[in-house]
Amino acid sequence: MRGVVSGVRDYGNRMGIPTVNGAVYFDERYTGNPLVYCGTVGLIQKKHVEKAAKKGDLVVVAGGRTGRDGIHGATFSSGELDEKSEMVSSGAVQIGNAIEEKRLLDVQLAARDRGLYNAVTDCGAGGLSSAVGEMGETLGAEIELDKVPLKYQGLSYTEIWISEAQERMVFAVSPEKIKDFLAVFAAEDVEATVIGRFTGTGRLALLYGGRQVADLDMKFLHGGMPRVVRQAKLDRPVFRDFTVPAKDTYTADLLRVLAMPNVASKEWIVRQYDHEVQGGTILKPLVGPGRAGPGDAAVLAPLPASRRGVAVGCGCAPKFGDLDPYWMAASAIDEALRNVVAVGADPERTALLDNFSWGNTDKPDRLGALVRAAEACRDFALAFGAPFISGKDSLNNEYTAGGKNICIPHTLLISAMGIVPELIRATTSDAKSPGDAVFIVGVTADELGGSHYAELLDARGGTVPRVDKKLAPQIFKKLHGAILAGLTRACHDLCEGGLATAAAEMCIGGELGMELDAAKAPLLARSSMEDARVLFSESNTRFLVEVAPDKIARFEKWMAGMPFARLGTVTGGPDLVIRGNGGKEIVRAPWQDLKKAWQGTFKGW
């Protein structure tokens, strides 16, 4: 864990790219296959979007040199692991150099602005084989592998071709511009070398030492493999509810939920990452006067002169996948969207990305679960009008040790990016001022299945949270309008730990108390529910919203027709007080105690 954090820190900070949003999820089934997701978003002028290599263009590799590190990296990451993997596959791990990457990035942008290349791609999975193969798909290419700059001698032409060594880009440069292109790179001391050309023959020809070592038809290379057919087994889960013990108070339970690794503060990670570099981060990972409360999403201002910004958030709910992968995927999408909506993003101008990490899809039950999750992505992208613009997958995440096979949980990370129309309306989650009203928006259902409270009780089964395809987009749109109209002072989505945890996090961030009546929360198809289920259900599409007294009437009028209720007020005292059925006090704790529990889990890491 520390190695992952230091890797992201050292590379990201040195690149001068702010690390502004993230999440951490623990499950013992990740022990053999720990997952790390890193993503970057950038701004590009429209005139630079369309890029394509042309017949006669030269193939140029620039940046770091090629070595044996990263050989079969994609193959390694796509296969099942065992006790010997660390020793026999260590060469599959690339060795990064952030300074080299930063120099390459800067000079690439300079060359772009001067119009010195026609196309560019990175050397990712498969190295030069994928980069050149993809760029030359419709043209064909001839590559002289002995011209590729090497870190050291002794590499075979196969190793040169498939090495995934980092910090390398491949460019298509017209012969008329190659002199200027190479001069720009040389001026910044970034190595750039012509290794071939795009031919127009439709074939991929590889040369080494004066002889041809490969000759493939591009159509065969890209479309020659027959479509793979596998068997999928679609299990329809049967939900069996569990009993929740009735208690006089749930304060201790709330403190325990706040301390759970998947809920607790990740400040020890956040503080190591530079989220201020470039000076465009408006909303940061931690919010409130003491910068201790959790932010729902980051808001960036990439164009200093513009009133508009970009919100970046994410959603991930692996525990739900144990019960139903379809609703796990739907919940991840809903979470990512409500995170960006909570900070002021327009849900109708939001795009999604998916990252699937799964077990061995040769096994029918694993593939069946993947099919169900993919169906949910389709269904809810259409329901929300939010397109998937990119994505990635990593399959076969299974580990065999001592004769026991361990498969990771079905894992889908959804990232959301949305336009914030008015940066001045960007909203944080911390409670702001005593006397303000606190509203809940959305419907609470009896959905403790896969929840953190269920984990606390060591309870299996229950009903997994679902998403209402018709109602959820309406709630997002209405709430966004209220935020844009300046009717809200704080907004926080209800997620891990449910209503009680969200209220606690707002109190921690604002260093204020609250008095809430949980029994007033809108419920699904019933007039009352056990206190514990109202407090800790992780139903989707819900928010806690703080509204100033002089805007309560306007907010209520604006949200008319949506499920919402006024639960209580922000108080100047330290205590979070929550009342349940019959007006009985079921939670009381000062924000200092809540903060201590929330921050204590990883204190000293």
Where are these regions (language model features)?
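Glycine/proline-enriched, intrinsically flexible loops and inter-domain linkers
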Residues: 1-605
